[in-house]
């Protein structure tokens, strides 16, 4: 019975943090014969949203060689069942651990190290525990951004519903924090055909859900530059798939730390950007936070590092690229 509960909890968590695989090309679902598509159809599908110009600056603030952007998707109860309408007390208690124990532990470490981070909230995660905003904002160096309404599968929604939920989320976060979020990270890191238009229409500064590069870049929609900064993510640089594989075994925090250190060292060598995504309810456990502690220690020892929020990075690369003119 205990094993079954563990498997259920792990499956819910991993499913919530895995990439959505929907690829609907018709109103009735995925086209079963894409090999028969015309060249125009293939190019149109691929070019909906594409990576445009590289926005990696010649150097980062203070002459730093590499930018380090730490982010936390504060999903809590939303991925522990709420977004699917599943009410199961055990998984929901794991979500509460995120706000009750893990987030304060993470912020305490960051504040002690003087390292800023960006916290992406599904609005309901913040509404259920608004005291999280006070914990994050106490130092004045962190950012709170938006990660949907209830970690909904935005790529499966019609345009009016997707926009309504994002507007609700932005307004709710602003009401709780006193500041309108300027950054967006799509739930499950996926776009609908309408997501980019909605994000642009709502005046957000940057987006951080896509994976076309290791460096910041400008998003292009149907071949047209949009002026939207993309700060790309990557599943290798996400704690969820590394700490929570499909099954009932867990990765060693020190093994995970080594993956991140190797990624950072290569980013440092290339002079680009290291963007890491974590979740308080995953990495905020006592045995796992050692991975973040060790990573920060390694990065500081390496030198030539600029630690910034996603907002600060987006503003900087826009300025360096002349996008504010």
Q: Where do the language-model regions lie?
A:
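Active-site-adjacent pocket scaffolds in enzyme catalytic domains
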Residues: 30-61, 171-175, 179-270
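Metal-dependent polysaccharide deacetylase catalytic core of the NodB/CE4 family, i.e.
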Residues: 104-107, 111-192, 226-228, 232-247, ...
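Bacterial lipoprotein signal-peptidase II cleavage site
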Residues: 18-25
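Generic enzyme active-site microenvironment
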Residues: 71, 145, 307-310
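C-terminal motif of bacterial Sec signal peptides marking the signal peptidase cleavage site
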Residues: 14-16
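C-terminal domain-boundary segment and adjacent tail
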Residues: 206, 218, 254-325
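Bacterial N-terminal signal peptides that target proteins for export
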Residues: 1-6
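Active-site beta->alpha N-cap acidic-glycine motif
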Residues: 33-141, 150, 258, 265, ...
